[in-house]
């Protein structure tokens, strides 16, 4: 199962409809094909999607929407999904998720979610309406109509027959079972500011030495109910630790995050799934970040069409892209918006980082007035 498009309406933090496309909009050259994933002749998916914006622009919120949409599609109860808080106190939030299934059909799931105040505080969410459309990809005449279902009747709608279903679980579960289809989602949203290495049976030595060449050994051992960590640096005695938190005394935050991330990358590339990372550059140097992006963009390595979806502050990362349509500019001006760079910047040959830093794209650099106020405040405090 591959995601083609996510369109969301009715979210409190968003200024307007959020419309995210994961297939190519611009013309695909022969060179481009090496970095894309082909689902059909002339139809290609991005393997690395970037969301960039200044601080507090709403990048994390966009990633939460994507995470929630993917989890709806994989039959997860909405009230158990960590990113459900993006729904807030929504009255009727509508998710339209277009995807390509393993029967070579283009499908569109529309799920309407409402909130209800919980007695203990917060909100409880339920699905109040659902419809599913389907059409064979062979019936699509051009890319323009790939996710267009106008004029088609839904093949299924949520009704009382789904009484056995929890009211926060999508009825797409029936379609997934019928087609024996699934979607694997790996999220590092919760690891943005927390770096604790979880217990794992296998940390590839190649990952460890890539991140820190001074480490000779790092592995977990489970004895009864107790987990021990064996850590050895070259030329030093082996250390045995009782708690993963203790690793922070010996390893950098970048090494810990790197082990978590690259171990997950291995699973994602094997499954053809989705990896969501907030602030990709956090704790990493540029070379490590670029390496991670290139793993997904390398069709000889990424044979299953796995997708990296990430946020960043760093415009230099945009220059890794030959295309503009895999990049979204996120802004928050009385509400969050995400705009595809190909709609703003028509030419691919313009250096993307320069366009971003220059302010040409609007809303991509801190406001000059805010900068001057901060400078004056700092100057006054130093008198």
Task: Kindly give the residue locations of the regions a language model identified.
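C-terminal lobe/lid and adjacent interdomain/linker elements of RecA-like ASCE P-loop ATPase modules
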Residues: 1-2, 293-383
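Pre-Walker A-like glycine/lysine-rich segment at the N-terminus of P-loop NTPase domains
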Residues: 2-67
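Hydrophobic positions in the central parallel beta-sheet of the AAA+
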Residues: 6, 275-277
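Extended helical coiled-coil dimerization/tether regions that scaffold
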Residues: 9, 184-250, 369-383
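Glycine-centered tight beta-turn/hairpin loop motif at sheet-sheet or coil-to-beta transitions
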Residues: 13, 100-106, 234-236
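Conserved P-loop NTP-binding catalytic core
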Residues: 44-50, 54, 64-114
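Conserved ABC ATPase signature
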Residues: 48-55, 227-266, 277-287
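Electropositive, glycine-dotted interaction segments
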Residues: 113-224
């Amino acid at each position: 199962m591959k995601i083609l498009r996510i369109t969301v309406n009715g979210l409190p933090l968003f200024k307007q409809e959020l419309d995210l496309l994961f297939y190519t909009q611009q013309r695909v050259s022969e060179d481009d094909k090496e970095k894309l994933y082909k689902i059909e002749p002339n139809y290609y998916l991005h393997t690395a999607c970037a969301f960039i914006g200044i601080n507090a622009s709403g990048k994390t919120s966009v990633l939460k929407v994507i995470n929630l949409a993917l989890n709806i599609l994989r039959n997860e109860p909405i009230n158990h999904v960590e990113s459900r808080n993006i729904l807030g106190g929504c009255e009727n939030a509508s998710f339209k998720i277009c995807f390509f299934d393993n029967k070579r059909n283009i499908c569109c799931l529309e799920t309407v979610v409402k909130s209800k105040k919980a007695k203990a505080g917060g909100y409880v969410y339920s699905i109040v309406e659902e419809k599913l459309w389907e059409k064979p990809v062979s019936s699509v005449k051009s890319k323009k109509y790939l996710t267009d279902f106008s004029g088609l009747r839904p093949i299924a709608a949520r009704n009382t027959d789904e009484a056995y279903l929890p009211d926060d679980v999508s009825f797409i579960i029936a379609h997934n079972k019928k087609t024996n289809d699934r979607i694997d989602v790996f999220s590092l949203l919760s690891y943005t500011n927390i770096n604790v290495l979880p217990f794992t049976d296998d940390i590839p030595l190649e990952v460890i030495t890539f991140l820190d060449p001074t480490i000779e050994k790092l592995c977990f051992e489970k004895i009864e109910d107790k987990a021990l960590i064996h850590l050895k640096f070259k030329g030093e005695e082996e250390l045995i630790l009782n708690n993963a938190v203790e690793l922070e005394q010996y390893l950098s935050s970048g090494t810990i995050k790197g082990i978590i991330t690259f171990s997950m990358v291995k699973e994602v590339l094997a499954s053809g799934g989705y990896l969501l990372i907030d602030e990709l550059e956090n704790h990493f140097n540029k070379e490590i970040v670029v390496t991670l992006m290139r793993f997904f963009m390398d069709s000889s390595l990424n044979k299953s069409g796995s997708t990296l979806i990430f946020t960043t502050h760093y415009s230099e990362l945009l220059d890794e892209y030959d295309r503009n349509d895999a990049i979204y500019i996120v802004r928050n001006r009385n509400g969050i918006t995400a705009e595809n760079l190909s709609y703003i910047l028509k030419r691919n040959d313009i250096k993307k980082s320069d366009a971003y830093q220059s302010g040409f794209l609007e809303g991509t650099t801190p406001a000059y007035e805010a900068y001057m106020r901060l400078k004056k405040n700092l100057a006054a405090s130093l008198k």
